[in-house]
Structure formats: C-alpha cells, structure tokens
C-alpha cells in the first residue's frame, strides 16, 4: 500500500490535482507501490470528476520517464490514434505512417493491439510480415535504416503491467485510454494524433504542449473516428511552433479528394485488413487510399515539408505510386525478421 497515494485519492475526488500531486500519485502506480484498490480508487476519482491537462501531463511524464527509450532523429514524428472509437475502420494511421515515411519523413510510430479497429496496427503489421514484439535496439535499427519504426507499447512501457489487471477489472475508460499517444518512447516533437472524442482534442493538444511538442494536430472525424475522416468534416486542435493552439475544420476537398461513404472504409479481420493495406500500397484506387492520402497530407503539413493539404496529398500519392511506401514495409519486415 502507498501511504503517499492514500490522501491524494481523496483530494482527486474533490478537486483537480496539481502537476506535482498527480506525478506523485502516478509514480506510486507505476512503481507497483499502490494496491489494486488504490489504483481503482484513483482512476475512478479522476474519471468521475474529469481529468485535467495537468493530470494528463503528469501521468504521461511519469510514463515517459520510466519507458525504454528509443533514439530518433530530431525531425521524426508520430502518427497515432487513441483507438477506442468503436468504428472498426481499416488501419488508416498505420498505412499513413508508411506513406509519410515513403515521402521522406522519419516516422517513429507508437502502437498496440486492436482497440478501435477489428484489427489494430500491430495485428495488421504482423500479417504483413513485420515482427512487432522487438526491443529498442531493433526499433532503432529500423528507424535508422528504413526511416520508420513501430514501437509496441508493452515492449517500451513495462511499468504499465502494474496497472493492467486493475484496468481490466474496471472495464471502463480511464486516463490510460489516452496516454498511448502522449507517451511516445522516441520523444518525438511532432504528432498527428487522433482522439476518440471531439472533447479531447483541445486538452490533448495542451498536454502535448506541456510535454514539449513543437507542432501537433489533434483530430477527430465527424463520423466518430479517431483520425481525419474521408466521409465529411473533421475537427482539429492544432499546436503551432509559436506555441499557439487553434481550432479549425478540415474537409477532404481541401486536399483535392472526394468524400466517400463510411461503409467504404470499414475493416475486417487482420488478414482482410492486410490485403487491403497491400492493395493500397500497390496503387489500387479506393476510399481507403483517399482516407490515407488525406491523413498523410496532414502529417506532411505537421512535419513542415508541405505548405498545403493539396500539396501533401500529391506528395503522398507519389509515395504510393512510386513504390516507396511499399518499400518501407518490405524494409521493416526484413529488419525485424532478421532480429527475431
């Protein structure tokens, strides 16, 4: 039992914790000092009252401090979603990561098993021949040689094991449902991050600012997806290099792309998703391709290599049609397979 945590649970139910108080509380969780009852008490107190930016930042900072880190270039970025949107779409952020890497931007992607898709990023990558359960040394080799890596959350955040049984028993969303995108082990400074709720995009942008990010787009689709949607409008909270956070909308037409019905981007089994993924990277036209082009355009804008979404979509299409994006998949599969 953690004596330090006990009074903080009571405080958390009544008021927002300060950054220091929240760091003390989450250190107790991640150090394995808290009992399951204390963990559950803290998580539910925060959820019931509603977490604050300081509490998000504190939890993420403690997780980052305890993670198995990865060395990455200064211009590397992450492309990730919270998951948990329940929409079962194709693996859009995963495909986007390879397209962006094919366009020359280093991508250090943080991910896990399926949450919102019928198969998550790790599931689709496994079907594509990529070994995901590899450690930091292999990840760094992949990033250095292929320009992209996939960091499996359990391989980099062992401290989370202390909390997993309690999370599973609670069976409801907690602060941990948004911590993945906030705790990239490569400490990237640029992010395209999807959220399962529009209400999260502003506080998540403010949290990333506190944690030292330079440029980030936090996005949510009007169809409920945790990415820029090809089915209509998306909402964005954008952190710019001057530290300002602005909120705006993105429409597919801004990238020169048509809208598609939601049914056209619904995924299936890991094998089905991997087949769609490969067809996309081989240049097959589809709603899936357009969804990936839209998100890739945004990522390239966040990376600072294009000035408009239309230019970004054109650059992304070139990455696909030249075979560069598929080449990145092949390279990562080779590097991770040689290491396993």
From Swiss-Prot:
Catalytic activity: N-(5-phospho-beta-D-ribosyl)anthranilate + diphosphate = 5-phospho-alpha-D-ribose 1-diphosphate + anthranilate
Residues at which anthranilate 1 binds: 81, 112
Domain of life: Bacteria
Cofactor remark from the record: Binds 2 magnesium ions per monomer.
GO-annotated molecular function: anthranilate phosphoribosyltransferase activity; magnesium ion binding
UniProt pathway annotation: Amino-acid biosynthesis; L-tryptophan biosynthesis; L-tryptophan from chorismate: step 2/5
Recorded family membership: Belongs to the anthranilate phosphoribosyltransferase family.
Function: Catalyzes the transfer of the phosphoribosyl group of 5-phosphorylribose-1-pyrophosphate (PRPP) to anthranilate to yield N-(5'-phosphoribosyl)-anthranilate (PRA).
Protein name: Anthranilate phosphoribosyltransferase
